[in-house]
Design a protein with these regions (language model features):
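Class II aminoacyl-tRNA synthetase catalytic cores and aaRS-like
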Residues: 1-155
């Protein structure tokens, strides 16, 4: 049975396991006969490596993936010292769930400054940036802890 998981839950101990990861195509690098797609979800990211000589059909499909498209990749986890997080997916299946508008109003993967009005008009994209997301995540955890403390102390 295929195990649907978050990228952050895939570790070296999963080497050889088949998993399914869904998320945004955060970064795409095409090096001729090999394409790397970094898939980002709410927990982290993992790299999928598509090789033309391994599966021409999957390689062709990977060529159609655009930045911030929502994808689902099923594949075997392989330990790799060169991949981000020291693990990568050797894909068996790739599904493009949803295509992003092109061109993107903001680039989530790069450190490009945008003016405030652009960021506010495209807040859904702005919140995907790790620095912006972490502020709201921290606030949420802080509020949760405060609420728990008040409950435990009878307030």
């Amino acid at each position: 049975m295929i195990n649907r998981t978050h990228a952050s839950d895939v570790g070296p101990e999963d080497d050889g396991e088949t998993v399914e990861v869904s998320g945004w195509a955060h970064e795409i690098r095409d090096l001729g006969g090999i394409t790397f797609i970094v898939i980002r979800d709410r927990g982290g990211s993992i790299q999928a490596t598509f090789k033309e000589d391994r599966s021409p059909e999957l390689f062709e499909k990977a060529q159609q993936v655009g930045k911030e498209d929502v994808v689902t990749v099923t594949g075997e986890v392989e330990e790799s010292g060169q991949a981000p997080g020291d693990r990568e997916l050797v894909p068996e299946n790739l599904e493009i769930v949803s295509e992003a508008e092109s061109p993107l109003p903001l680039d989530v993967s790069k450190d490009i400054d945008s003016d405030l009005s652009t960021r506010l008009d495209n807040r859904f994209m702005d919140l995907r940036q790790p620095e912006v997301h972490s502020v709201f995540s921290l606030r949420s955890h802080l509020m949760e802890s405060m609420e728990e403390w008040f409950d435990e102390n009878g307030y």
